[in-house]
Amino acid sequence: MPSVPIVVDDDPERAASAVRGYVARFVSLGRRGSNIYHRLMVDAGFGAAADRIQDHTAAGEHTAAAAAVPFEFLDRTALLGPPDRIAAGIRAYADAGVTTLALSPFAADPDGRAAALHVAAKAVAPTRSTP
């Protein structure tokens, strides 16, 4: 089951900033040839970025590693932006055959994380019709 970061924000680029460090840490685990997250980036067409992330991390440059995570990669693998964009992302996962998502809400506090999950729940809730 895919684990998907979710950040609700009017600005998708700003939302992406909240998860860059998280993604960089996973891409930097272990060696290039054996890291599934590095391989995911390579397979998605972001091999040079994945290598830069690992190089920066190996040099202790964690801020640079996070900055090297491309928005385009995050936009394909996370739910970022305002509620309508989050809903469209969830629909894209469903259209690809995903039936269950494990969401990882990124927010500064528990209320923000709960609000992000509420946005996701509203996106998948069946629409009620009035008789």
What are the functions of these language-model segments?
Residues 1-131:
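Active-site-adjacent structural elements that line small-molecule/cofactor binding pockets in enzymes
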